[in-house]
């Protein structure tokens, strides 16, 4: 075999590239997210105040300059939340979503858990002050059932009131900020609001399940890996913003325009500053601003019911629309099956039917390539010293016989959007968390874990997962049934390793995803067994050479 380019080598390279796409695609997908606009460096607070026609607020005197040593912690619990409020910054330092009443264990999540020594969620500060208001010691002025009121007053300057209303029937927190101008001149109060979300212990190894989002005219998103490397800043008009992790979301919509959003990672927590446009308060007057907060599971129908666009977080990304369609189809099917495993099987079967014509075209392409092998080998032998002439004649041969040398890879390429969409749906849809299928498959969002091992093994880890091995076996069978197209023995050996590579990639994938791929392989095997052998029709000049 000549060492120059050959159709067999091209086929192998095409297949290898298809496999590589499945492995590296999540990293490449970030390129499809719109880049956030760079924010100019912020001017010093005092300079900003001068530009606005104001005198900068002078630092307060007395003990305010000292960090409060003992902020009070107020604990609260209702049907949906466990929360701890701190008088330091009038903020939430611990927030737990207790889970759906009908399924507490599967849907419970710790959304934030700080030490209480630093300001927490919903801490606010005025950016034209030289002192950080988020570290001021507020007074708990009123507590009435699910509502809390905190007050901080700077004598002769302003009175700042924060009110929290914790819903016991839906995952909603209503926040009010009241600013009263105690001075004798109109003042501007530019506010930064702090947001925070705790990552789970294993989220550092997952993709697209811990993100920052902001809505301008579309969802701007960045995962925590990108935030760690480059940061995430959005400037311009922002309607709402938030932080996401696997299954859960913290989303905030103010009733005033936000002008910027800066996100940073500290330890295992994402922190963000939502920068609001300045609030103008006349002398002796007060103004109240409202913040609508959702802190709970990422459920499409729930998010859509608010009518503010929160549901768009579930259709973000390059394949976001297809993911949403897949999710809605599974929800519809679930009304009748009551089991998400059967829903996955049903959707896999329907998708296989949809792609059947293209799969048949792929089989036809591979059969033609096999039939053309003698002609291709003849061209290679005649022009082995002239690669340009050899490649030209090979392309003419493909064109004359209407065959695409990469046609055999078509079914694999078509599965990429489905594969990625299934993966993301399994990582976003809380209803699939802990959802069992049959026999040993107890959680479709996790590896199937037939057996737990008493030790950790390389690659395998501490569990024996059977489903990826069944998938690997189905790939070997499918590979045997595919026409090899006269591949040289060394290339056939390389091709034979593809199932092993897939087995390695899929071993720790969610069992729902492996189930989809395994069933797709089984259906392909059945299809190849039922379909009659392809009758290859070559050009009459080439048919006599086969």
Task: Identify what each model region corresponds to.
Residues 27-106, 150:
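Juxtamembrane extramembrane loops of integral membrane proteins
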